[in-house]
Every structure is written in C-alpha cells, then in structure tokens.
C-alpha cells in the first residue's frame, strides 16, 4: 500500500447532490478549480460540433456553455453540456444540463439536473430555489434522460422524474 499527499481540489461525486455541488464549485471563486489555468489543462475528445451560439436575447452570467449549445434565454450559475438549447424567454439557474437538453420558451429550471435529451416544455417549471420551499422539503430536482416535461407542468423541488414520466420524491 502507498499513499500520496494530494493538495488540490477533489470531490467524490457518487451522489446526485455531490455531482451538483462539484459543478457549482467549478463556477465558484476560490474553490480551487480554475478552468483557465494553463498549468492545469483539461483534455477532452474533439468532436466536430459548432461553437456555442449566444443569440441577441441571451443573458449568460457566471456559467459554462459548451460547444453546439444555443442560448436565446437566460442562463445563470449553471453548466450546459454540449448541444443544449435554452429558448428565448426561458430561464436556467443553478442547474446542470446534460447533452441535448432543451428548455423551451417561457420555461424555468432552477436548482436541477436535467439528463441527456430532456425536453422541458413551454412555460413548465422544474425545481425551485431553497427560499421557495420549507427546508425539510427542499432539494435538487433531477430529471432522468429522455424525459419529456409537458408544457405548463410544474415539477417541485426535491423531485425525481424518470423517462416514463413517473414522479417521485427524492
């Protein structure tokens, strides 16, 4: 057995909450993660995708938006994987969107993790800020891959939705 004294950033991301925490750490000042540090390169496979597109109505603040994504709405304190879409009038806050996730016009996603190819319909609501729910009822909202959230639907804080549309409390 051997040991190595490690002094950099490390986080076990074995739970959904710790995955969300690690992504938010990436956005936080002083977390030890600096994506622009040339001495700490990030190696990723190169895919043939266009760069991210930020439209005239886009508002992006303190977020990471990766290649192939299109943003016309507002994205704050969030991480968007490749090929995500945030339509005009949509809002995404404190959330992680996996590849191919779509947030349609007027929808709001807050404190959530959206799986691959999730579609959030027009004017739907997913998740909520910690202030919007009693502490014992609040938590990150998780939407499984391929799930479709109908227009106008509300998925409260601390809920999980699978691809078949079954909702459970986390």
Report the location of each language-model feature.
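Left-handed beta-helix
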Residues: 1-170
């Amino acid at each position: 057995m051997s040991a190595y004294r490690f002094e950099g950033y490390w986080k076990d991301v074995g739970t959904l909450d710790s995955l969300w925490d690690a992504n938010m750490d990436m956005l936080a000042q002083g977390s030890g993660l600096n994506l622009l540090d040339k001495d700490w390169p990030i190696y990723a496979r190169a895919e043939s995708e266009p760069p991210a597109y930020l439209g005239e109505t886009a508002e992006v603040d303190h977020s990471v938006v990766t290649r192939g994504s299109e943003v016309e709405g507002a994205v704050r304190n969030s991480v968007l994987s490749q090929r995500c879409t945030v339509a005009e009038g949509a809002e995404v806050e404190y959330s992680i969107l996996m590849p191919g996730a779509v947030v349609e016009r007027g929808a709001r996603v807050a404190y959530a993790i959206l799986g691959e190819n999730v579609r959030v319909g027009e004017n739907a609501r997913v998740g909520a800020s910690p202030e919007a729910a009693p502490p014992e009822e609040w938590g990150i909202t998780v939407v499984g891959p391929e799930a479709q959230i109908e227009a106008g639907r509300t998925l409260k804080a601390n809920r999980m939705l699978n691809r078949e549309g079954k909702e459970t409390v986390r």
